[in-house]
Amino acid sequence: LGPKRVVSLTVYDGFLYATSYDGGRVYRFDGETWTDCGQIGDDTQTYAFTRYEGRLHVSMWPSARVYRFEDVGRWTDIGKLGQELEVMGMMVHNGRFIGGTLPLAEVHAYDGDGKWTLWQRLDHTPDVKYRRAWTMAEHAGEVFCATLPSGRVWAARHGRQVSWDHSLPSGWHHIAAVKTASRLTLHVNSKQVSESSGFDAAEWNLDSAAPLRLGTGMNGPFNGQLANLQIHRRALAASEIEAFSAKRPE
């Protein structure tokens, strides 16, 4: 990349991608050479990456816009976050695409069709030029955001979810997700590995006109194989989960 300052790196669809403070461009590496993926809008800096609905997205300065990667030299503008100047940390939390900003350290959520909604401003430090919702991570069903200059870490939760923050080793594994009237649980090879906080199911409307998609999600496709998929109309008991777990694919 020559003298350009690299900001963020990510791997997507077999390539290594890089953003830069020098020019509103993204570069990708195929193992031998770097390719310029084109000028993005009228911006002068590219910042963060995230994958949403299986597609690579990048954030910008000074427009505070997010662009979706279509192909080399082709980017689609999916909207501006408020009246901000830069989008910093980005991630997908429980299906919602969110981004943190500068100079007011706001967090916005993507509603689709180029529209973003303000969730909350996180840093109110007085008498400074820039406040940043800088970087994000997800853990134990919550999203965390670090802010500057206040030096605080904020946590939030959108809906309810369970996760197991470990990588699965190679081979077949039985995964069971169970919803009761007050809790979600996750089971790996018949062992319960995660449990949500309590809730009242009557307060949640889970009706949806969206099609059921298997093996893919809001982040992207599942990297592996699926077999013996079952959907039950009731919560399974631990003994039932154990029995299903014992039946591995041939």
Please place each PLM-identified region on the residue numbering:
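Extracellular glycan-associated modules
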Residues: T10, T50, M91, K115, ...
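Tandem-repeat/low-complexity and Cys-motif detector
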Residues: A18, V58, A202-W204
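Trp- and S/T/G-rich repeat-edge/linker motifs of beta-rich repeat architectures
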Residues: L1-R5, V11, F15, Y21-Y47, ...
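Glycine-rich, histidine-containing beta strand-loop boundary motifs that form or position
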Residues: S20, M60, T101, T147, ...
